[in-house]
Amino acid sequence: NIKDTYRQTKEFLKRNIPVLYTGTPCQIAGLHKYLGKNANKSQLFTVELCCHGVPSPRIWKQYLKENVTDDISNITFRSKINGWKNYTLDIQTNGHTHICEGKLSNNYMRGFLMNLYCRPICSSCKFREFSTESDLSIGDFWGLPKFYPQKDDDKGMSLILVMNEKGNMLFQAIKDEFYHFPISYAEVINGNTNYLHSVPFHTKRELFWRMINEGKSVNHSVSQCLKPTFFQNIKSTIKRIIRWKK
C-alpha cells in the first residue's frame, strides 16, 4: 500500500532531500509518472523488486481473520527457519509463534504461488523487461543451486541488478559492505523468469473466487482448487517409482 508516499516523495524532492523509494515495478513506474517528466529527480533513488505478482488484499485479510484470533506481533512471509528454498510463513502473536508453515504446506502461500488470487492486471503486466526507470533491481538468485552449487548453503543469495548510472553509483557506494560476484544475464533470467514474463492465471482462479464469494474459507477454497487431479496423481506415482528403482 503506497498510501501517500508519492506525495511525500514529491515534497522531499522539492526540498532537495534524498529519497530512496523501493517497491514493485508498477509502483516505481507509477511514481515516475506522478512526478512527471520535468521534475527534478537528482535526489531520487529507486529500487524495484523482482515481482511474482501482487496478491489480493481481500484474501490476505480474510485469511488472517479466519486463522488468527490474537493480536499479531510479527509476520515474516519468507522466514528461513526451514531453509531458503522451503521458505516459511511465520506469524507470531504476542511474541509467540502462531503459524509456521512451509510454502508447500501453508494454503495461503500455495494459493499465491499458484496464482489463484494475484490481481487481474498482473497477468498482463506492462512493466516487465526492466522498463520502469529503476536504478537498481533486487530479488532472490534462484539460479544459485544450478550455476553455483558450491555457494549454496540454503540460507539464500540475493540478486542486485544495476540498471543505470545512478544505480551504479549506489552499488559502488555499498559494495564493500557485503560479499558479491558478477553473474551473466542468462544466469539471472534462468531462475527469475518474472523479469520477462507475467504470471499466468491458474485455470481454477474463477472457481476459487466463486467459492470465496459463496462464503467458503480461504483454506478450504485453496485446498479444493489445488487438489491433485487423477492424472497428476498417476504422474506423481510414476516419478516415485522411478526414484525408488534408481
Regions found by a protein language model. Name each.
Residues N1-K246:
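Iron-sulfur-associated redox domains of electron-transfer enzymes in respiratory
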